[in-house]
Structures are given as C-alpha cells and as structure tokens.
C-alpha cells in the first residue's frame, strides 16, 4: 500500500514547502478517542492564539512605558512555541492514541506537564518573562489603565489554557492507566525501536490476523478416477 500523503500544515500550492505530517482523526484515531484528541488539537490552537494575543498586549505594555524586552520575548514565545508545542506534545498524543503507544504517552505526559507549568507561570505574569499575566496587568493599572485592561486579556486566556491543560492531563492519564499502560511498556517500545513510527491499531490488527485465515476458503479436491455413482 502506498504511503499516505502529508497534509499538515496545509500550505498554499505556490510555496516551495510541503506539509510535514499526515493528520486525519477519522482515519487514524479510534472512534472512542476522536473527541478527546480533537480537543487536544483545539487546545494547541487556543494556546497559539493566546500567544498571539499576548504579543499584542506586550506591545501595548511597551508603548505605555513598559520594558521592550517583554515584547521581544513574547515574539520569541509565539515563533518558538507554536511549532514546538505541536511537535513536542500534540504529535506524541496523536501517535499515542493512534497506536496505543506507551512511549508516546510518556512523552506526552512529560512535555505536556512542563508546558502546563510554563503556562501557569505565564498566567501569573512575572516581570521580565514576556507574558502579560495577572501580576503584570494588575500592577500596571497605576501607570496606564488602557494598557492594563488590554494586558488582562492574555492573563485570562493563559489561566483558561492552564485549567484545560490540567483537565486534559487527568483525562489522558485515566485512559492510559485504564488500558494497562506502564513505564515498562514504554521501555520495551524504546528497546524495540517501535516508538519512532508506531503502526496504527488497524495495521497491528491486520499484521496479527492477516495470516490466520486464507483469503479464500480452501475447497477440498477429489480425484476423478474414483468410483462412479450407480
């Protein structure tokens, strides 16, 4: 069977770049997990949008008298975390549910957990982090009310992102443990090298059952030289 053509990210045909990944929820993700995986994908999009809003808020912060370094860091976070969050925690989640891969589940938990901690820090809004969180927004009301109101928007969005991330970790962990996942299975996948490109569940089933039955039933043949009916 020919390999599936990559379709993500969708790029205009005039660009010399081509999509890097194949992504189709209905084709690769089991029906019972499609809703959850789609929600994780929407969470990634929501977080990227939050980084974009944060960039605008940091610009308002800078114009109103804040440090320009915050705007520079906000731009860096947007450019860096948009692709990296997709590759580092959404794709492991996608592959984990696609192939029931313990290694990819472990990768998701580790990196997504770090992402959750970072998002909480961004929601708090420590000075010099390039994030318009609560501390930065509330503390700037004495300088510029208009800019502070704009800065409250990413603070709210970062808080919502962190909340949804916490709920997502709990849900995915329950499914993983309920299916019998463990660190030992992840180590086995690492040793066998199947973590690189784990086959889908359908491919695993076909590999298991493909030779168990012939494609067509075997029909017994009888010699024509035997006796005849009277």
UniProtKB/Swiss-Prot annotation:
Sequence intervals crossing the membrane: 40-60, 61-81, 106-126, 149-169
Q: Where in the cell is it found?
A: Membrane
Q: How does it sit in the membrane?
A: Multi-pass membrane protein
Q: What keywords were assigned to this record?
A: Membrane, Phosphoprotein, Protein transport, Transmembrane, Transmembrane helix, Transport
Which residue stretches, if any, does this entry annotate as coiled coil?
none
Mark the residues carrying the PTM Phosphothreonine: 194
Topological region Cytoplasmic: 1-39, 170-230
Report one GO cellular component.
Answer: membrane
Entry keyword annotation includes Transport: yes
**Pfam families cross-referenced by the UniProt entry:** SCAMP
Keyword Membrane found: yes
Instruction: Note the InterPro entries from the entry.
Output: SCAMP (IPR007273)
Q: Name one GO biological process term.
A: protein transport
According to the lineage, what is the superkingdom?
Eukaryota
The principal location of this protein is membrane
Q: Which family does it belong to?
A: Belongs to the SCAMP family.
Any idea what this protein is called?
A: Secretory carrier-associated membrane protein 4
Record the organism. Mus musculus (Mouse)
